UniProtKB/Swiss-Prot annotation:
Superkingdom as given in the UniProt entry: Eukaryota
Location within or outside the cell: Nucleus
Keywords recorded for this protein, A-Z: Apoptosis, Nucleus
Chain positions covered by the region annotation Required for nuclear localization and apoptosis-inducing activity: 1-70
Organism from which the protein derives: Mus musculus (Mouse)
Pfam (any one): Myb_DNA-bind_5
Polar residues bias (residue ranges): 318-327
Cysteines engaged in disulfide bonds, as pairs: none
Protein name: Nuclear apoptosis-inducing factor 1
InterPro entries, per database record: Myb_DNA-bind_5 (IPR028002)
GO annotations of cellular component type: cytosol; mitochondrion; nucleoplasm; nucleus; plasma membrane
Gene behind the chain: Naif1
Taxon lineage: Eukaryota, Metazoa, Chordata, Craniata, Vertebrata
């Protein structure tokens, strides 16, 4: 008997992926590795089941929890691979190369102080990948588009032994920078202006520049450093929030201690007032009882009978018998 083929489920839609990323952004303190220190497994499992319910609410076919976790793992792997390509290109001093998903590969022209070469299309992240990158805490670089040109200004070669000829690189004056999301830096450039005239050579006394570093690599390094600084600032802000929460807890404890001390002080005041009232009542009672005690003593003294005097004994005979008997 032939085994029936297993029906393959449809791929995750954009809406499902958006829900997964949105829920993970809301529950990052439970599910993201560098946020969920000390979170119990039961809380993590409940959070994943909540994400699964939201995904199944919009999905065309029923999803299982391992499928959702596998999709999130694939999204993280793809974003980390692109960021690794950018870092490798920055460390190697070359522009980031194209990827299979970008579809932006193509030849270009570029120039550097060390020689001539071909510029490769930069690695670009989609807005969803940028959100995932920020969620993972990776330093993101969005390189300049391939249409941006760098205009070198050739200076005169006449110089003395103490002077060095400096090649100036013109950056478009209308370049602006803005932040898409926290930790993501994007470069937006307008049309490149025409190159400066090269008629008048300029001589400057300076140290010979490092010709091995390309301008594009310098820009990429600056962007990487800025992204790292932003990430460090985010971590610092988290520490500051934790310290603030700790201080708030301590303030709450201090307020509770103060309230208990106030309650104890009120109780002591009430006890002191009660003691004073008792003492006043006793003093009044003593003052009332004193005349009564005096009157009672007088009464006892007046009503007590005086004892009768003892009778004188009769004459006793010499032999010890009374005289009446003798007579």
């Amino acid at each position: 008997m032939a085994v029936p083929a297993k029906k393959r489920k449809m791929n995750f839609s954009e809406r499902e992926v958006e829900i997964i990323v949105e829920e993970l952004e809301l529950k990052k303190h439970l599910l993201v590795n560098h946020f969920n220190a000390g979170v119990p497994l039961a809380a993590k499992s409940a959070a994943w089941h909540g994400i699964l319910r939201r995904v199944n609410a919009v999905a065309t076919c029923r999803r299982e929890l391992p499928e959702v976790k596998k999709k999130w793992s694939d999204l993280k792997t793809e974003v980390r691979r692109k960021v690794a390509q950018v870092r490798a290109a920055v460390e190697g001093g070359e522009a980031p190369g194209p990827t299979e998903d970008d579809g932006a590969g193509g030849p270009g022209t570029g120039s550097g102080s060390g020689g001539s070469g071909t510029a490769i299309a930069p690695v670009l992240l989609t807005p969803m990948q940028q959100r995932i990158c920020n969620l993972l805490g990776e330093a993101t670089i969005i390189s300049l588009p391939s249409t941006t040109e760098i205009h070198p200004v050739a200076l005169g070669s006449t110089a003395t032994t103490a002077a060095a000829t400096v090649t100036l690189t013109q950056i478009p004056t209308e370049t602006t920078y803005h932040t898409l999301e926290e930790g993501v830096v994007e470069y937006c450039t307008a049309e490149a202006p025409p190159p400066l005239p090269t008629e008048a050579p300029v001589e400057m006394i300076a140290q010979p520049p490092d010709t091995s570093v390309k301008p594009q690599a310098l820009k990429s390094r600056i962007a990487l450093n800025s992204a790292k600084l932003i990430q460090e600032q985010r971590v610092t802000n988290l520490h500051i929030k934790e310290i603030a929460q700790h201080l708030e807890q301590q303030n709450g404890l201090l307020q509770m201690i103060r309230r208990s001390q106030e309650v104890q002080a009120c109780a002591q005041e009430r006890q002191a007032q009660a003691m004073e009232g008792t003492q006043a009542a006793l003093s009044v009672l003593i003052q009332v009882l004193r005349p009564m005690i005096k009157d009672f003593r007088r009464y006892l003294q007046n009503n007590t009978p005086n004892p009768a005097p003892a009778s004188a004994p009769g004459p006793v005979a010499q032999n010890g018998q009374p005289d009446s008997i003798i007579q």
